[in-house]
């Protein structure tokens, strides 16, 4: 763990109870993982971190290079991220910092920066081979006029409530709709459906976090010759899809083969899902090996 530049073990890493990230959820974060010991798509994650912080009028006190150094320092201390045998999960948290009990941003003179590193744990083989179950939950995704979903905020109550409902129904992920009833995203991932060989995902206008893996899959699909497009989706588009899958940084492409009690398509991971998943994994390996060579 790294708290404001100092490395601690988990038992001794602390932040103040007066940190506004703790008091008010006032902060942003990014989650990354390594492939071949390299933080994957680091630059894109940092761009999103800065976009999120800008919307909160929160300064990022470090350069991307400094943040990368802190990640590597923390990975080294944890004995992780040296190669394929010990890949790392990385979370970077930026908060308003320590201040008085006040919503006034001026109450916090210095932002807090925390880096958490632990071993990367991939989903089970069964999740990739048989697929996971989704649940259409009643919790509505944040309205952009309140807490904009474009902000990857430390305040995750909206997602947590949706995940609680999904978990009670035995689902792996909850599918959230926006205030218009359109599908937005899942609780911790972006959603794609496949129809007639085309992978479709809701546009940002449907009120979702711009996932790094989601965006990268457009590039992966183009290289693999698989159409990947944005489209407004509703419940029936998911229920009547040929295939479906979810994407996230730590999981890549995970097939979804069931919604509540209904099978999606044939009820097994489909060819488009498998092809995109394989192409994504191959591209991740290629890019991180190139980074490793340049570093050497």
Give the role of each language-model region:
Residues 1-175, 179-182, 209, 218-296:
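Conserved alpha/beta cores of soluble small-molecule-handling proteins
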Residues 174, 182-204, 210:
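Glycine- and Gly-Pro-enriched alpha-helical subdomains that act as flexible
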Residues 213-214:
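Secondary-structure junction motif
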């Amino acid at each position: 763990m790294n708290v404001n530049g100092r490395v601690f073990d988990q038992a001794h890493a602390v932040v103040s109870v007066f940190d506004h990230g703790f008091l008010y959820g006032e902060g942003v974060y990014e989650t990354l993982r390594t492939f071949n010991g390299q933080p994957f798509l680091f630059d894109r994650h940092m761009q999103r971190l800065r976009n999120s912080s800008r919307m909160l009028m929160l300064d990022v006190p470090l350069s991307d290079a400094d943040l990368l150094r802190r990640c590597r320092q923390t990975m080294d201390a944890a004995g992780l991220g040296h190669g394929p045998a010990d890949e790392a999960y990385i979370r970077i948290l930026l908060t308003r910092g320590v201040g008085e009990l006040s919503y006034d941003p001026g109450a916090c003179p210095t932002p807090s920066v925390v880096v958490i590193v632990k071993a990367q744990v991939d989903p089970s083989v069964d999740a990739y081979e048989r697929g996971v179950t989704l649940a259409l939950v009643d919790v509505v995704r944040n309205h952009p006029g309140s807490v904009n979903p474009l902000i990857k905020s430390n305040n995750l109550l909206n997602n947590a409530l949706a995940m609680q409902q999904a978990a009670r129904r035995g689902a792996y992920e909850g599918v959230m709709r926006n205030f218009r009833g359109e599908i937005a995203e899942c609780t911790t991932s972006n959603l794609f459906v496949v129809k007639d060989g085309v992978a479709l995902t809701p546009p940002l206008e449907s009120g979702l976090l711009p996932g790094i893996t989601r965006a990268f899959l457009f590039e992966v699909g183009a290289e693999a010759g698989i159409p990947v497009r944005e489209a407004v989706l509703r419940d029936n588009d998911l229920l009547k899809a040929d295939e479906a899958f979810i994407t996230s940084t730590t999981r890549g492409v995970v097939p979804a083969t069931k919604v509540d009690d209904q099978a999606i398509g044939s009820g097994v991971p489909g060819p488009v899902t498998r092809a995109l998943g394989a192409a994504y994994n191959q591209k991740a390996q290629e890019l991180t090996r190139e980074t490793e060579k340049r570093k050497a």
